Design a protein with these regions (language model features):
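Extended substrate-binding grooves/exosites of carbohydrate-active enzymes
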Residues: 1-119, 124-130, 135-143
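Extracellular/periplasmic ectodomains of large secreted or surface enzymes and adhesion receptors
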Residues: 77-79, 90-100, 106-107, 193-211, ...
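Buried hydrophobic-core signal for structured, non-transmembrane domains
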Residues: 117-124, 164, 177-181, 225
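Exposed beta-strand and adjacent loop surfaces of beta-rich binding modules
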Residues: 131-135, 176, 218, 236
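Intrinsically disordered, low-complexity Pro/Gly/Ser/Thr-rich segments with frequent PxxP/GP/PP motifs
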Residues: 134, 138-173, 178
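Local beta-strand/beta-hairpin segments that build beta-sheet-rich folds
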Residues: 145, 159-161, 186-190, 246
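Terminal connector regions
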Residues: 168-204
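Beta-strand/loop-rich accessory regions of lumenal/periplasmic or secreted enzymes
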Residues: 170-172, 199-285
Length: 285
């Protein structure tokens, strides 16, 4: 129950005499299910791994004064508060972002998109993909510019390669292909970059005409049309070029993030609060 994916794989390697199933492997409270793919990948590698179960499908909540409420909203104490909100859909049956991740992980069709070929794998046991419509969209800089539709014969537990119908000539724009399988509505979808604009390089002009100024608190670098100030405590605090300041506030590292709902329950703040302190009081040495 809630065994780490790496530990599940270790068990599967060491015990090849019986199937393995997780009664629960994902607790869908709040911002969660981001690691679900790790367990799904194990299903593709080990036939003895039978998968697991998500806790759970729908949030439990009651309407009160026109809004959905959970523990504590009715004035009761003690309470488990939001621990009843563990669903991949909200209590009013609308989807959460978690539903999209689960939908993607659980799909029976895999796509791998190359510049010339789209590789399709059908993991259904009995269904041929010719029952669905295949739609492909070409996106440039995030905008759909071309759409192609077709039917593809791909028998259960087999793979097929389809020629990518889009020709990429303009390499100054980011290009991606989105593939859909539809049957009156979207069933599967996957998007992949086929050309990503790389950061353009610029020639760096070096100069020896710089002055270094140092005092007890700061180190300054002064050159033609620019100056930089480093605080001995906070690091980079100012960078000016042609009288334009590019640093609004001192740059500082961040080793901590806000806790998710699941983090709160497993005492994340207590265990990792020291990294928040390190972020707030970091010093240059």
């Amino acid at each position: 129950m809630y065994t780490f994916a790496v530990d599940v794989e270790k068990y599967l390697k060491e015990h090849q005499d019986k199937p393995f199933i997780l009664c629960e492997y994902a607790h869908s409270m709040g911002n969660s299910n981001g690691a679900l793919f790790k367990y799904i990948d194990l299903e593709k590698k080990y036939s003895l791994y039978q998968g697991g179960f998500i806790w759970d499908y729908i949030d439990q909540a009651l309407y009160h004064d026109g809004k959905l409420c959970y523990g504590g909203d009715f004035g009761e104490r003690p309470s488990d508060y939001d621990f009843c909100g563990n669903g991949i859909v909200f209590a009013d049956r609308t989807n959460t972002p978690k539903m999209q991740e689960v939908k993607y992980c659980y799909q029976y069709v895999d796509f791998r998109i190359d510049e010339d070929v789209i590789h399709i794998s059908n993991n259904y046991l009995f269904t041929d993909l010719n029952e669905y419509q295949l739609q492909m969209d070409l996106l440039r800089n995030g905008n759909v510019v071309q759409t192609k539709t077709m039917t593809v014969d791909c028998q259960p537990l087999s793979s097929v390669d389809v020629e990518n119908p889009f020709k990429i000539n303009d390499q100054d724009q980011e290009c991606a292909v989105t593939v859909y399988l539809k049957k009156n509505h979207e069933i599967y979808a996957q998007q992949q970059y086929i050309y990503e604009v790389k950061n353009k390089t610029h020639n760096i002009h070096t100069t020896k005409h710089v002055d270094i100024v140092e005092d007890y608190l700061n180190v300054g670098v002064v050159g033609k049309d620019f100056n930089v100030i480093f605080s001995k405590q906070k690091g980079l605090v100012s960078y000016r070029y042609h009288q334009q300041e590019y640093i609004r506030v001192p740059v500082r590292p961040n080793f901590f993030r806000a806790a998710t709902n699941n983090d709160v329950e497993n005492k994340y703040g207590y265990r990792y609060g020291k990294w928040l302190t390190a972020s707030l009081y970091a010093k240059c040495e």
